Structures are given as structure tokens and as C-alpha cells.
């Protein structure tokens, strides 16, 4: 486990260094043009994260289909809950799985681990050397540098970039508390300038939000994000 963790950490550093080394200093604008837009509706009303990944895979030239990814690659756990000996509500890990059915309005959400697994299993099946990397915790400077490098970033945000409201949650079998909010959303960051960001949204399409609004919401979701890298 130690070696694996060291490799992942080293890989993250390499990603950031690769991004820094190819940047123009003080760049104020960058956008990925002709980015494919895929709408999650009507097939996947709660499948925003996997639809965001579908867009990124299509950007890299893969024949990815959202429903194929959702039902053949995305780790899914049934929405089964119970109370433990301490009377705590317990259920599946929202980070590792999509909880529920993304094809219904009753589905919940999933985290970066689930999206990375779906991406990596798909990429392996395609015989690709690309792989997904969880870069959660990235700084905003580093985040925007990926866009300058024409690397789209799957980001965990909120629907319509609204401030995150009240959350609900439960404990996993390992005792970790996981939470979700009704309007939790996944999308793709594809551009930015001094005042705004451009988002490829699985519901709204290509849309701009103020940079301050985006950064506030992105931070409220823990700076969670994923990229694909060779």
C-alpha cells in the first residue's frame, strides 16, 4: 500500500509539473474549443458525473456513450441502508460507488473514486494508454493551467452553480461519514478568463459562470476533480 500511495503522490506531482512547464506566464484566458456536449437527460436524470466523464472521453476521440458507461463501467451500489449498534444510519460509500440508479430521479451521487474506476476500466477495454487521475485538492492556479494545456477537468460542483444547501448523509461500513445535497452536480471545466469560467454542463450545455461563484462552489465540494492523462 505504501508503494502504491507513493506512486499516486508522485504521479500527481508529475501532472502538476507537466502543466507548469508548458504554460505561458500570467495567462488570462484559455478555452477548449469544439468540446463535445452530452446531455444527461432524459436517460440519466441523476447521472451527471458519468455524463461529464462521457464528454471528456469523447473529447479524446473515444466512442463513449453515457448509458454504456453508466451501466457497464460505473460502480453502482443499491440504496440500501441500516442502523448500526450506535443507531447511526449506514449505507454504501458515496466516494466509491454511485448509490442508487442514475437512470432514475431517486439516484444519489458518486465521487471521484467511482468516476476514476469507470474511466480506467473503459480506457483499458479500449486499449488506451490514457488513465484517470484524481487531482482533488488542486489549487485554482493549477486547475486553470490544465485548461491552458487543453486538458478538460471533471469538476464536482452544484446545479446552476448555486451555493450548496443543507446536506444529508450516513456512515460507511468503515465508519466514514459521507454526505450529499439535492443539487450536487458534476460537470466539466473547459475555459476561463479573468472574470468567468466556461463549463460543459450535462444539463445546461456550455455555460459561463463568474469565477468567484465557481470557486466558492467548487471549494464547497472539496475541490474534487479528475483528469485523463497519458
PLM features per residue range, with description:
Residues 64-86, 126-133, 216-217, 223-230:
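Cysteine-dependent hydrolase recognition
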Residues 100-141, 145-149:
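Mid-length scaffold segments of soluble, non-membrane domains
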Residues 169-174, 178-181, 187-230:
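Noncatalytic regulatory segments and standalone regulatory/sensor domains
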Residues 1-117, 159-161, 167-180:
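Active-site-adjacent structural segments surrounding the nucleophilic cysteine of cysteine proteases
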Residues 52, 136, 157-161, 191-193, ...:
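A mature extracytoplasmic/lumenal domain signature
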Residues 47-49, 132, 153-157, 188, ...:
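Structural recognition of the beta-strand scaffold that forms the well-ordered cores
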Residues 140-142, 163-167, 207-210:
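Extracytoplasmic/secreted cell-surface and envelope-processing proteins
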Residues 126-130, 148-154, 193-195, 223:
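Loop/turn elements at helix/coil->beta-strand transitions in domains of secreted/extracellular proteins
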